[in-house]
Amino acid sequence: MARGRIRSKLRLSLLYTFGCLRPATLEGQDSQPIQGPGFSRTVFCNQPHMHKKKPLRYRSNYVSTTRYNLITFFPKSLYEQFHRAANLYFLVAAILSVFPLSPFNKWSMIAPLVFVVGLSMLKEALEDWRRFMQDVKINARKTCVHKSDGVFRQRKWKKVSVGDIVKVEKDEFFPADLLLLSSSYEDGICYVETMNLDGETNLKVKRSLEVSLPLDDDESFKNFMATIRCEDPNPNLYTFVGNLEFERQTFPLDPSQILLRDSKLRNTTYVYGVVVFTGFDTKVMQNSTKSPSKRSRIERTMDYIIYTLLVLLILISCISSSGFAWETEFHMPKMWYLRPGEPIDFTNPINPIYAGVVHLITALLLYGYLIPISLYVSIEVVKVWQASFINQDLHMYDDESGVPANARTSNLNEELGQVHTILSDKTGTLTCNQMDFLKCSIAGTSYGVRSSEVEVAAAKQMAVDLEEHGEISSTPQSQTKVYGTWDSSRTQEIEVEGDNNYNTPRAPIKGFGFEDNRLMNGNWLRESQPNDILQFFRILAICHTAIPELNEETGKYTYEAESPDEASFLAAAREFGFEFFKRTQSSVFIRERFSGSGQIIEREYKVLNLLEFTSKRKRMTVIVRDEEGQILLLCKGADSIIFERLAKNGKTYLGPTTRHLTEYGEAGLRTLALAYRKLDEDEYAAWNSEFLKAKTSIGSDRDELLETGADMIEKELILIGATAVEDKLQKGVPQCIDKLAQAGLKLWVLTGDKMETAINIGFACSLLRQGMRQICITSMNSEGGSQDSKRVVKENILNQLTKAVQMVKLEKDPHAAFALIIDGKTLTYALEDDMKYQFLALAVDCASVICCRVSPKQKALVVRLVKEGTGKTTLAIGDGANDVGMIQEADIGVGISGVEGMQAVMASDFSIAQFRFLERLLVVHGHWCYKRIAQMICYFFYKNIAFGLTLFYFEAFTGFSGQSVYNDYYLLLFNVVLTSLPVIALGVFEQDVSSEICLQFPALYQQGTKNLFFDWSRILGWMCNGVYASLVIFFLNIGIIYSQAFRDNGQTADMDAVGTTMFTCIIWAANVQIALTMSHFTWIQHVLIWGSIGMWYLFVAIYSMMPPSYSGNIYRILDEILAPAPIYWMATLLVTVAAVLPYVAHIAFQRFLNPLDHHIIQEIKYYGRDIEDARLWTRERTKAREKTKIGFTARVDAKIRHLRSKLNKKQSNLSHFSAQDAMSPRSL
């Protein structure tokens, strides 16, 4: 790493800084007043005692990321648990169960609730305990703090206060947000790693103010005192506004002097800093907001099912209470032995209405088993297992980066199987974000003969098309190379050369893919405009914020740059002979080599001002003074921004440069324009004075003042040229897009790149293809910002949308494909309320949608429009900080762990290392998780309806007595133990088809998108199946057992024998039903299903052997009453078969007469080549993929249609000529 010299002797006269980062002191200037709210923080440096009383008492440095503490855990956690309707119902039921009205023992209601809620609370507690232990570890870290008289002592982080002077040493984390005062380097710079903040691994350089450089050792802080007035705490990591008041002077502060908590000091021995923000006031803690809470569609539907069952529960409870009131009034007087006349009795026939109301409470408790109490906790367990399978899938592990897939939340697993629209970023997502400098335009001449991947792919396609038409001759591939660019809207000549003088093969260089001998090895000196080329190279080498690092093995410098583009520019400058090798606070140093002779000249450029690149400015400017004393302004930025700032005499190369930029964009390259101007001393001094005033202001208008100041100097530029770097497609992107298209998914691309670049990347990854009609919606240029001009532009866009919608709707060719392309400026109008639904209507009818030049906010707005306008599940995928908004807005957010940092990953629900892994995440895991959760929930409701309604039938059968036919311990174990494990196995291990089949038949994914397994017809079907099973279980058992000689001594079965027999049938029916539901068995499923049945027999055997004081009427019920009775075993077999018979009949009917796709595939897989019905093979081959108009497969289909058309036309012509020959006299 390039470093400044370690301190030996300070030479302040040689120390300067970037003007925008370290302006000169303003003599005699008073501190600026605090301007309004948001800028009220005052920090007394080295005087922490000043901050112990209000209003200057700020937060401590103790941080806690836990959700609970010892006092709040139980109330807050219980509140979270009883937000769920089912848990709230069971809480009320458990409370009522302690009263005499309850038909159950109170523990049969309380124990399951305590178990389920306790399990969930235990999970919350464990997660919070992990967070607490992490907090303890962080708060106990130690750092050196100035106590007094120049003495520093170790102190825990949590005891660091605002105003403390802190000394941080190499590889230590910063304990709070600090203002950098000095460092071990004489020029006051330090290197900081911010991976914990933004995930970026490249080091950032920080620079102290010049005035604080003498504070270079412990003793220097003995009498140090200063005041900081700055902004209030806020979450913006990249801004800071404030002033330092020191020695009666005011110095402006900005982000380059701020060291943020949780970033690490690297490659610097030590730094001194003063604490500005502590604890939750630090920027990292201000950013620790939670991602928006997301719930899957299945979970939301599940709530409605719960409400439906609650309505059913209330309905049958009302029926039961009405029946009881009837019985009380008309039949109870005859039952004298019940002593119904007592006033306190609930069965008093004098007041049947009161008796019915009281019985309603009993009925609500009795039928509560219709609501599955263990549903929520079972789903949580299953989703955690599913997420672990996603995390451990080796097919989604990236060998190059060593990064696996990561399910950051388990709440949305099943939502992965219902995605309708994917909205993707381009750079770093579809492309690698590893830039190669490929071409450039200098002084109106284009350099660089190497073709981009997009050009090669396009030229190959065009060569094939032209060869078919006989327009070019075949040339051996080994002797051809394609030059020039390709335009999708017009046909160009393809130049084929076997040899050329522009290129000499060389070893690959990272970031530099340029090939053109005209600029290499000093050959540029022989070009027609060598001075302009020299200026171009110097802009590349000087206009940046990178840090050089010497590679000792190669002897070359590599660069820690803020973006891959910047690193590629520096690599290009180095290869052209202009090597950036050193940076200090005041200067950059360049080694210039003008020819192949090896002569090297080292030059120093004093950096006077640096106006950094932002997404709003879209440009970067450096003002330097060269060794001759000339002040130069060097600027690079988006072509649209640079061109509008050109001087009249600076447009000499505007025409050819514009043409080259268009060609580069069509080749899929990222472009920037380069310009410069010379400044005289007076002009610079006047501007710098005004700019410093803007820098020292504190207030909400500071950014506006700075922008105005930058505009004052960034004008009258002279255009020198443009750069073109290639951002290659990631591995497997075209194949992944093709597979997703075959699965029926729609893909939108949202990018900040220009339209030409986005279009050609679209062609490269098969989102666009030849023959696809491109609908480009653009806004016409309008001067001024008046309401009238905006109205005209809006009407023009609306007119374009209307015409496009009509064109698409009137298209009769079923194979016609449309692509919608719109830029950010136009999108601003298209997203307004009165136009957005017309835009959406057009977009959903197009095969692909590409939005260019869009801002991060527009990305999020587009996602919101698609999500709310279509009502379908949306997935947003990106890799950068500018993608966070759309990732959080989408139903599912997927982050890619790329070189742009980890902000997208930290905001996402799932993260993957490469876009290509999205195919497996959705088509395999999404499909599996959707079907597992859907079947699991349906089965839960089936078994609880089947069980709960038997209580209602028995209630009616016994005169609405409010009596349960089952022992309380049976009820206790039913949901929690005896039927819970098999359903968890279903949710975790079920596979209707294997992963290979999912990828081979991607159209299976549409089962989730169409919600085939969790629509209301499927849900009601399972409910009806549960109702049928309950009828069979109750009435068949009653019919078999009631009034029959059950025991060998002629005794009939009592209530407990009937209840135990019915419960046995329920356990068998429920577990056999889930066995029939499963398509994929492992030994785990067998153990859990048949083990649950065995567990029932084991329980009842042990329980019935206990003394009567514990077992009550169940004493010896299995070995003495049920087991010896053949009718018990016959009833179990008969009832179980009858209960599952309709499901077996339904499946048989469906598989034979109306099979679903996975049924056919299962038979194909099972029978292999012995399958007799060849129609099934043909059917599944044609249905293996959804009909799509994008992707490589769509290209192939279009080509096949084209060939068939030509063949049919040829055959038609031959038939015509044959008929003419037959009719000719010669043939006669």
Swiss-Prot record:
| Keywords, comma-separated and alphabetical | ATP-binding, Isopeptide bond, Magnesium, Membrane, Metal-binding, Nucleotide-binding, Translocase, Transmembrane, Transmembrane helix, Ubl conjugation
- Which Pfam families does the record match to this protein? Cation_ATPase, PhoLip_ATPase_C, PhoLip_ATPase_N
An annotated GO BP: phospholipid transport
Give me the Cytoplasmic side stretches, as residue ranges: 1-74, 124-305, 378-934, 989-1018, 1078-1083, 1147-1228
- Membrane-related topology note: Multi-pass membrane protein
- Oxidoreductase among keywords: no
GO CC annotations on file: membrane
* Transmembrane region(s): 75-96, 101-123, 306-327, 360-377, 935-954, 969-988, 1019-1041, 1055-1077, 1084-1104, 1118-1146
**EC no.?**
7.6.2.1
Give residues for the crosslink Glycyl lysine isopeptide (Lys-Gly) (interchain with G-Cter in ubiquitin).
616
Q: What would be an example GO MF term here?
A: ATP binding
Write down the chemical reaction(s) this protein catalyses: ATP + H2O + phospholipidSide 1 = ADP + phosphate + phospholipidSide 2
Active site annotated at which positions?
425
List localization entries.
Membrane
**Its function?**
Involved in transport of phospholipids.
Q: Which family does it belong to?
A: Belongs to the cation transport ATPase (P-type) (TC 3.A.3) family. Type IV subfamily.
Protein name stated in the entry: Probable phospholipid-transporting ATPase 5
